[in-house]
Structure formats: C-alpha cells, structure tokens
Amino acid sequence: MALVVGLGNPGTEYMGTRHNVGFELIDRLSEKLTITLKQGNGLFVFGEGQFKSTKVALMKPLTFMNRSGSAVSRAMNKYGFGISECIVCHDDIHLDTGKLRLRPGGSAAGHNGITDIIDYLGTRDFARLRIGIGNNFSRGKQSDYVLSPFTNQEREIINEALDNATDAILTFIRGGIHLAMNKYN
C-alpha cells in the first residue's frame, strides 16, 4: 500500500501557484493511474486505485497548507496507512526551480505544512518528495512569492519536473523510498 499526499491550498485563486505544486502532482498521478479523487469527510479529497499489484491512495488536504497535519493524520487513520507507506510531496524554496529531492524523513526545513504534519503524526520519519520552486524574492516577500504563479519560463521547467516527479512516485510505489532516491536524487 502507498499513500501519496500532495500539499497545497484549496481554491481556484491558488491554482498554478508555486505553493500548489504538490496538488498539481496529485492531479497528474490521478490522471495517469485513473484514480478519481472524491471528498473525504471535509478535510481532504481522496482516491484509491492500483499500480501494478499495489494499492495506491492519492490525497490532497483541504485544510490549507499550514494546517495539513490534521487531514493527513485523519486519512492515515481512517484508511489504515502506516508511516512507512506514506510520502508527502511539496514545494521547496531551498531548491532551484524544477529540482527534485527525495528523503526518507528529516526536519521540516522551515516548511509550515511539513511542521504541522510532524506535529500531528508525532514523527519526522515519513518520506518526502520536495519540488524546487526557487527563491527569487526580496526579504519579507516569501509569502507573496510562494502564492504567485510561475513565470512562463518557470512553468516549462516545472512541467518537466512534474513529469519526473510522477515517475519518482511510481518508483516509490514499486520499490520504496531508497530505490526512488537512488534513481531521482
């Protein structure tokens, strides 16, 4: 079993923003794996399917980025996923635009959504796929930056990164985080 969580903010005003690359990845995986996402008790949208012989669930919290922990915790408990079966996909300003980084766990590195998930799960030991969005912003303008859309040039890079991220997640589902790290880091 695998639970793939993509972080972002709900609402059309956030579509296409840097902070929502996790949501975009879930949408791509949903299409590729023909998994339909449905409302899951108000805190998230959720869909289940198969990849090869593995049960796969896709999830997008609807609690806004910085409050993702309650939705992730609820989905894991409701559907019976363990920590080792979960991977959280999110934006990262510490990586160049389009750069991917897979990790088996670790600190939140300043990402408030990850901090909230760590707080709710009580552990830092869950896999992550970090998707670089760059950090081309002035001091004090981080929020404006992450909530803004990509430039046309950045969008081309991000689209390619999301293709690679889709493949990285499928590798995670097939063989775990270390196989995915060896292939995509």
Locations of regions flagged by a protein language model:
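Nucleotide and nucleotide-moiety/phosphate-recognizing core
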Residues: A2-G105, T115-L129, N136-K141, S148, ...
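Hydrophobic alpha-helical segments within soluble ligand-binding/sensing domains
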Residues: G110-G113
